[in-house]
């Protein structure tokens, strides 16, 4: 990384120059620097609304960058150790889908864990690729799926030598890391591309002593959520590619679905955040890791909770653990994770990332302070004292291995009918069902609906999980294939 070049922020600098010129706008957006919508200015501020501008020659164009955006992407590639980088304004969802659409066509096989984000499975609906699932092991106590074991990947490749790609979560939402370097070496030896979903792994590129990043492991493409742990605005992301990937073709794929009206608020936030991480990321993420470790120790000293970390590492299904993650098991105090999540928000004004059936996740990043950690620890101690109960009747287990009947694309576009959830047992799902967050589908199109899955959906609803994916907003009915 050229640290001197990293002091530049070309999109931000171009916007600063643009502001000085007092250009009269006869283009979009129609609020005309906020003059047409004073309430927007009141909410967001004059400076923010004044920078919500359209693509123009001095500001470049994201669909075909030739100047400041191109330079910003080159700086991002240098900072992340990639051959090329693409600034994304459709979230990491669009980056994940661009990876898959760039490597797979209709009928192609892709090897992936089933505990992927819905964006990956949505990409299979779009392109018609066939999933070959490597079903990860479960941690029976925590109820979470683990990483992809190298032996599982080897078996999947042996049985599907014509696969085009392997997709790896690095890390999972809960912080679990696979042996990425070995997976990359194995796949490449068979001529198969490796894609990494690093929605929760921006910090891996800049922190010392953290798990290995996708590009460092030799992956071909990586989708990186700068807005999650990198400090940019929500919805901004970066797609990274290695030297053996045709960057021009990837740009064409991105432009199939990405907006032609890219937000310069998002683009400049990516530019500024990349500079910040390149110059100060190592120091910042060292503090994040320290805060997370302190929180783990304090929470575990309360009793009843289990804030897990590298103590889980076993060298296979948990090859490493992302120590910045603060994942906490709650069932031993008699409360589901979603119940603790709701209590923290409703009674203590603390908003954490998510709560599921067994766990909660508090996202620790460069914007957190030690006093915020103390407040969280105090609230968890209070919740245990005031709300803990007998754990009888609580369901454990966060992931159920699916049985695939037809491809996601075929199922999604098939004729379907609506049936009540428990009456759908034995049918093939025609839609997604998931708790969001984390956005890992309980059911995907083309999968067999078992009694266990149906009961899990009902239980998750009863516990207050936010359910998504179904046509029925109440999630009382499921769309299933007619035949």
Regions found by a protein language model. Name each.
Residues 87, 133-135, 224, 354, ...:
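Structural signal for conserved beta-strand scaffold positions within catalytic alpha/beta enzyme cores
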Residues 294, 300-469:
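Conserved C-terminal alpha-helix-loop-beta "cap" of PLP-dependent enzymes
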Residues 8-16, 20, 40-43, 79-82, ...:
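Conserved PLP-enzyme active-site core in the AAT-like
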């Amino acid at each position: 990384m050229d640290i001197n070049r990293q002091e530049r922020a070309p999109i931000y600098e171009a916007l600063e120059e643009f502001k000085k010129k007092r250009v009269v706008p006869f283009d979009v957006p129609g609020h005309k620097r906020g003059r047409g919508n004073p309430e927007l200015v009141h909410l967001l501020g004059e400076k923010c609304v004044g920078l919500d501008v359209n693509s123009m020659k001095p500001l470049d164009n994201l669909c075909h960058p030739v100047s400041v955006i191109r330079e910003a992407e080159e700086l991002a590639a240098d900072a992340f150790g990639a051959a090329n980088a693409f600034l994304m304004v459709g979230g990491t969802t669009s980056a994940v889908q661009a990876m898959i659409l760039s490597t797979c066509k209709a009928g192609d096989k892709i090897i992936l864990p089933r505990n992927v984000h819905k964006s990956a499975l949505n990409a299979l609906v779009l392109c018609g690729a066939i999933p070959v699932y490597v079903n990860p092991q479960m941690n029976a106590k925590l109820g979470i799926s683990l990483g992809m074991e190298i032996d599982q990947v080897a078996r999947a490749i042996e049985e599907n030598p014509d696969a085009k790609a392997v997709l790896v979560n690095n890390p999972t939402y809960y912080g679990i890391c696979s042996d990425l370097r070995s997976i990359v070496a194995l796949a490449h030896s068979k001529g198969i591309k490796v894609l990494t979903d690093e929605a929760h792994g921006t910090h891996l590129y800049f922190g010392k002593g953290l798990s290995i990043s996708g590009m460092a492991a030799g992956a071909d493409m990586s989708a990186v959520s700068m807005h999650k742990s990198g400090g940019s605005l929500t919805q901004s992301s970066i797609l990274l590619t290695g030297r053996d990937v045709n960057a021009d073709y990837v740009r064409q794929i991105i432009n199939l679905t990405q907006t032609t009206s890219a937000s310069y608020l998002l683009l400049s936030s990516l530019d500024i955040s990349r500079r910040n991480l390149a110059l100060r990321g190592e120091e910042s993420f060292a503090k994040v890791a320290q805060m997370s470790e302190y929180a783990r120790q304090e929470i575990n000293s309360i009793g009843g909770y289990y804030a897990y970390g590298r103590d889980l590492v076993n060298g296979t299904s948990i090859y490493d653990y992302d120590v910045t993650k603060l994942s906490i098991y709650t069932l031993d105090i008699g409360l589901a994770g979603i119940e603790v999540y709701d209590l923290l928000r409703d009674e203590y004004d603390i908003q954490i990332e998510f709560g599921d059936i067994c766990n909660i996740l508090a996202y620790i990043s460069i914007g957190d302070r030690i006093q915020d950690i103390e407040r969280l620890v105090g609230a968890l101690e209070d919740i245990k004292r005031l709300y803990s109960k007998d754990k009888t009747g609580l369901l454990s287990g966060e992931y159920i291995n699916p049985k695939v009947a037809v491809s996601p694309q075929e199922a999604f576009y098939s004729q379907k009918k609506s049936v009540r959830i428990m009456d759908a047992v034995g049918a093939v799902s025609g839609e997604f069902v998931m708790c969001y967050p984390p956005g890992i589908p309980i059911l995907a199109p083309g999968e067999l609906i078992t009694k266990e899955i149906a009961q899990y959906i009902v239980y998750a609803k009863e516990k207050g999980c936010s359910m998504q994916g179904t046509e029925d907003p109440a999630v009382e009915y499921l769309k299933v294939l007619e035949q």
